[in-house]
């Protein structure tokens, strides 16, 4: 259920950003921003989701049997995920240079959004590792609630930021809001994991 709430809150704030953006940008700009965000999220979850599906149940099962081994596996997975997500970020940054020329003129202008979004995969990786695998797989009902609360806080922060950045920076501001929100999630997940790191 906390995982569902996290997905729901993420979906809500990302859709709300597009709605707010509609008051300040043309449909063409919104389309380019949305394309850039979809490219970023597709690359992130194409890589992160399989890793999570493989290691989440292993860590969760192991935490009930041998806590020290579960934490050891968590540490190894953390290094793997963060390394891979950093590579994804570099790939997004690099692709921002040549993607418009490959896909055509309709995609010109995506580069600036993709360069901002290039910072997001690492933050998503941090939030995923410390949140899903740390607070949930290694945790208990209490830490699952903390996981849920992080996304509520992030959604509120996102709403506040979008009314600050979007009116002045339009789609660039929206890209900053998305990236900043994922950074907020990552920081709060690390904080809560460190706070409850002895739960297992």
Language model regions located:
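Interfacial segments at transmembrane-helix termini and the short loops linking adjacent helices
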Residues: 94-123, 139-141
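Helix-loop junctions and terminal segments of transmembrane helices
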Residues: 36, 40-67, 131-137
């Amino acid at each position: 259920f906390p995982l569902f709430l996290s997905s729901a809150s993420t979906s809500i704030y990302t859709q709300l950003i597009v709605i707010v953006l509609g008051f300040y940008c043309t449909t063409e700009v919104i389309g380019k921003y949305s394309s850039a965000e979809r490219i970023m999220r597709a690359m992130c979850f194409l890589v992160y989701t399989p890793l999570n599906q493989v290691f989440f149940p292993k860590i969760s099962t192991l935490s009930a049997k041998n806590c020290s081994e579960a934490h050891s596996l968590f540490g190894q997975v953390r290094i793997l995920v963060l390394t891979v997500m950093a590579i994804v970020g570099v790939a997004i940054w690099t692709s921002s240079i040549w993607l418009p020329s490959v896909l055509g003129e309709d995609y010109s202008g995506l580069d600036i959004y993709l360069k901002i979004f290039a910072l997001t995969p690492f933050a998503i990786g941090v939030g995923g590792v410390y949140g899903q695998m740390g607070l949930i797989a290694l945790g208990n009902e209490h830490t699952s609630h903390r996981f849920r609360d992080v996304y509520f806080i992030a959604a509120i922060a996102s709403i506040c930021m979008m009314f600050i950045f979007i009116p002045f920076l339009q789609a660039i501001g929206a890209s900053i809001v998305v990236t900043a929100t994922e950074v907020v999630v990552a920081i709060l997940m690390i904080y809560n994991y460190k706070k409850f790191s002895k739960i297992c």
